[in-house]
């Protein structure tokens, strides 16, 4: 079990019903927060989110030598986990929990249009150049065109989890019953459905999937990475990111809960209580692994793969070999998560809405800025030189480092 002491796991048993959901015994309510923002299961940290328990440490002191520049910000209304901006070359789409969908100009943050879904939303946004897709906890999938006009709506088998993926004429929808649905982008009709049996206990997964070269790459409960043909739903290959270990179901959780990253001819993913693994994009051959556990996802530049681990330490690994380039542990007490490229720097976030800039070459802390004081709904996405994310308070930020 990677990086999580047994004592911490025993403490986590008391909050498992809050943080996790069981596929048996009637199921437990899931934690209404951004799951990828949390460190390894810790009762103290979880209760602090609701005003009790121990608070995270004071802000670290370091010389500010870079400017975390907020290029623009848009208030769209309170947003739940599972809602995250969709970045396309000419537009950013975002939605709030009450059902309002926005198209935002990525150059300046101007709202191009807004439209109403007519119901509360739990998942989205997925988009390409012509289609914008959102989902509800009732299993409704709603599609709009790039001008905000309703195109179609269909119902799938269970609640929609995380942003749909729109690519190659297919809308991919992930549902709470473990299914992956391939819908035709033209009318929403089901083209294929993939299903696998989930372990008894899993982390609620809001990540969705990544598409490239006609394939969908998606992580699963139990630590697998799937390569699925978008046209047919057939599995091309299955890679092992992590292997469940331990005596209890809680200890055996080894889920891929963040977006895989496709870079050149490899695809990489990270698992909670597991490791980072990179595979050949076409053949699925394992290229390298590194024992780093994370819920909050990875990003890649021309040299390194970046990840914030479950304890809040930030790592840079050689993207070809997995060798460690540097490790920054100065934000562990702040529960840093969600590493993403922002201009010349690496950006990470903490649960109190602070963002930090790190020098990508050596991991040195160089900048900091405050946002609205609420956690992110998901890992930041990249839009040109900006990192773009949405907070639970309802602000969409575009930030770069200078």
Question: Predicted regions: what is each one?
Answer:
Residues 365, 371-402:
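Blade-level signature of beta-propeller repeat domains, shared across WD40, Kelch, NHL, RCC1
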Residues 91-93, 132-134, 171-173, 181, ...:
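Conserved beta-propeller blade signature
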Residues 96-97, 136, 175-176, 220-221, ...:
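Structural signature of WD-repeat beta-propellers
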């Amino acid at each position: 079990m990677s990086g999580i002491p047994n004592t911490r796991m025993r403490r986590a048993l008391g909050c498992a019903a809050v943080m996790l959901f069981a596929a048996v015994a009637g199921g437990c309510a899931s934690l209404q927060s951004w799951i990828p923002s949390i460190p390894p299961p810790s009762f103290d940290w979880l209760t602090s989110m609701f005003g009790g328990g121990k608070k995270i440490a004071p802000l670290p002191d370091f010389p500010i030598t870079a400017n975390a520049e907020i290029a623009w910000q848009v208030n769209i209304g309170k947003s739940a986990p599972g809602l995250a901006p969709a970045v396309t070359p000419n537009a950013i789409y975002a939605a709030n929990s009450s059902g309002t969908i926005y198209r935002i100009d990525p150059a300046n943050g101007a709202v191009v249009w807004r439209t109403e879904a007519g119901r509360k939303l739990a998942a989205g946004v997925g988009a390409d150049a012509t289609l914008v897709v959102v989902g509800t906890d009732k299993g409704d999938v709603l599609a709009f065109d790039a001008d905000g006009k309703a195109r179609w709506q269909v119902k799938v088998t269970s609640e929609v989890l995380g942003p749909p993926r729109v690519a190659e004429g297919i809308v991919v929808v992930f549902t709470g019953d473990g299914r992956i649905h391939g819908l035709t982008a033209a009318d929403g009709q089901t083209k294929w459905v993939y299903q696998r049996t989930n372990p008894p206990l899993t982390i609620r997964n809001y990540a969705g999937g990544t598409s490239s070269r006609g394939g969908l790459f998606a992580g699963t409960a139990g630590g697998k990475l799937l390569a699925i043909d978008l046209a047919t739903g057939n599995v091309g290959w299955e890679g092992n990111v992590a292997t469940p270990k331990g005596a209890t179901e809680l200890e055996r959780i080894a889920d891929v809960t963040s977006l895989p990253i496709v870079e050149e001819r490899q695809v990489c993913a990270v698992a909670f209580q597991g490791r980072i693994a990179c595979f050949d994009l076409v053949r699925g051959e394992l290229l390298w692994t590194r024992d780093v556990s994370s819920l909050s996802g990875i990003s890649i530049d021309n040299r390194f793969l970046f990840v914030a681990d479950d304890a809040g330490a930030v790592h840079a690994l050689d993207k070809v070999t997995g060798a460690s380039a540097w490790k920054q542990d100065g934000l562990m007490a702040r529960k840093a998560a969600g590493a993403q490229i922002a201009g010349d720097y690496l950006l990470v976030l903490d649960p109190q809405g602070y963002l930090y800039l790190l020098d990508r070459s050596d991991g040195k802390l160089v900048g900091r800025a405050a946002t609205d004081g609420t956690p992110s709904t998901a890992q930041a996405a990249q839009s040109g030189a900006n990192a773009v994310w949405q907070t639970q308070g309802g602000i969409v930020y575009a930030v770069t480092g200078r």
